[in-house]
């Protein structure tokens, strides 16, 4: 979900840079992987790659489709964008319902809220690099799929 100008702090970015950043998150929230064509370069680097993800813009599109199959009501709300020319940091929250398999975990029907922190490099109005960190451990706890710790399994 693109942020509303009156609710999100955005600093240091040109209008074109801000649009590219917002478009990346809209691809997920609107269920439209083709929005990546407007947001990221063809050789965009998503760091780290997710399991099974191929590099580049085209490598992310199947991941978005799989993500939307697992979480069809996904919404990403951008809370803050902090930028300098050519760089942006994003603090966001992702919400949804676990309706399909993800990370090998069968659907639970439980809703979740996950923090997202990402850093982007931008050139010529498109993202060239994204370093991302999502709270997947918190997601597992929220859906009731807490991993078994080594100490628990040994006892």
What does each of the following model-derived ranges do?
Residues 1-155:
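C-terminal and inter-domain tail/linker signature
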């Amino acid at each position: 979900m693109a942020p509303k100008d009156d609710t999100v702090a955005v600093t240091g970015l040109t209008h074109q840079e801000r649009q590219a950043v917002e478009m990346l998150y809209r691809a997920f929230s609107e269920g439209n992987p083709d929005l990546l064509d407007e947001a990221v370069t063809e050789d965009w680097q998503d760091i780290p790659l997710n399991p099974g993800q191929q590099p580049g813009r085209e490598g992310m599109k199947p991941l978005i489709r799989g993500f939307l199959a697992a979480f069809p009501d996904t919404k990403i709300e951008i809370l803050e964008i902090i930028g300098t020319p050519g760089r942006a940091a994003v603090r966001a929250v992702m919400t949804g319902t676990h309706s399909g398999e993800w990370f090998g975990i069968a659907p639970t029907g439980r809703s979740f809220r996950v923090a997202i922190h990402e850093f982007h490099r931008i050139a010529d109005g498109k993202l060239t690099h994204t370093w991302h960190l999502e709270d997947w451990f918190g997601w597992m706890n929220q859906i009731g799929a807490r991993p078994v710790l080594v100490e628990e399994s040994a006892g």
